[in-house]
Amino acid sequence: MLSVPKSYTNGKMDQVVFQKQRNRLNQCFFKFKNQTKYIQFRLSEEQYNKLKISGETYGLSPNLYAKKLAQKSHLKKPYLEHDQAKSLLLELSKQGSQFKSASFRKLLDEHQLLASYSKPGYPYDNAVTEVFFKYLKQREINRRTYHSIQEVQLSCFEYIEQFYNNYNPHSANNGLTPNQKEENYFKKNIAHLTETDIVDRLLKGSPALRVGYQLYQDFLYAVKERDYVSFEELLTNNIMLPEGYQTILRTFQKFLPQIKNALQQSYSNGPLECLNNHIKVLKRNAYGFRSFYNFKLRIMIRHGNALIFN
């Protein structure tokens, strides 16, 4: 099991231990891609991106998968998520005193985490994050006064979604904005797929979705063939499905007598329900009719039974 050295005493020992720490990422953010199923990276930048709201200090902390704002106590949240996901979490930080402290190293060891430390005076590991926060503060944060963390979250969300992703080009994207780059990627890699290929890819990546999709198709086939026996078997043989599916199955169980009648009898109220739905749509749209006669006439024309009386 990989971990940082276990030395929790303060003083000169800390400096000796951390001289041996190396930059595990070395700007290769996907170097562990083939070794672990889940990889998470956290960048510790609170010491440079603090914000005071109503006398309380908050840290602006980025995540490579989702840019969110959190309080300083947010450190423990990714650790708890890491414990549940059984994934490899790399804590990328600078060699500040708060990240060399015994308590911080002890926290890493308790959750079996790795630390990757940038070299002193070497800003390139966090260059992207530094630039992002620089312009975030210049263009948005420093121009406003906030009274709650919710206001900050909304402000940053609007900046990222409405401006940064749509109007901020990057040289790394050949002068394209993030949204344009993403759109080009999907056009190049996804557009050629058929609907069947897309469904197959989705089902291949999620076993639970695959089981649920197959159950859905089985129900459709049973209804199409009017096979009540198969329909009832599907309700009793899928007790191990996730809770989301169990809700639907319980609804089917509740109305099972009515479903049985619908599958076994030759008549159906489907046409009547269809007619009522069309009437509701016509009524909702109104079509500008102000008299009941014109409204009734429009309904009859829609269904091909119009009789015009003088």
Swiss-Prot record:
**What superkingdom does the record give?**
Bacteria
Top-level EC class: hydrolase
Q: Which Pfam families match?
A: DDE_Tnp_ISL3, rve_3
Entry EC number(s)? 3.4.21.-
Q: Which residues form the Integrase catalytic domain?
A: 24-186
Q: What is this protein called?
A: ATP-dependent protease
GO molecular function terms listed in the Swiss-Prot or TrEMBL record: nucleic acid binding; peptidase activity
Gene3D superfamilies in the record: Ribonuclease H-like superfamily/Ribonuclease H
User: What are the entry keywords?
Assistant: Hydrolase, Plasmid, Protease
An example GO BP is: DNA integration
* Native species: Lactococcus lactis subsp. lactis
Read off the InterPro entries from this record. Answer: Integrase_cat-core, RNaseH-like_sf, RNaseH_sf, Transposase_DDE, Transposase_IS3/IS150/IS904
